[in-house]
């Protein structure tokens, strides 16, 4: 599929099938994220894959939407301000870098036939990545 076909295919999905995703697809998606460009190649991100029932229940407290509860997995994209590049006027590029990595994830998932949806309107105090087994 061409890039434009992939870009047309990728959209926010809010209804998910209750099935497992093959490990090969997960690895492929994470590799696409790892290859995402970042300012000065600092790669100030890390990813938390949440698949346990306990972890999913905790994460659902951060974003209590019915459609969100249907997803078989969650991938939390986290950024580290201590590792991100700051330009001369102190603009921190962590948000830009993690957004690029996130879209790499979404495009790779679409290519693999998987649906994704960015979630940005979550409770930041409840959503701490070390809380999700």
Feature map (PLM): residue ranges:
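Acidic, surface-exposed loops and disordered segments
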Residues: 1-133
